[in-house]
């Protein structure tokens, strides 16, 4: 997958990320869910990312303020 990064976005397409929202962690057994960025969009002055959650076929939208990169 190409590593397309939108200007000003924190994460690029294909980046592996964690989501630190309290509810998401609670739903994932107390651990932050991991996913892969599919697309970034700017909405109301901040970035949102469509992410495919690891280990599932679920695609969801995460806010940049609650995301962190996976160091590899």
Which residues does each PLM region occupy?
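Basic/aromatic-rich interaction segments and small domains that mediate binding to polyanionic partners
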Residues: 2-4, 12-70
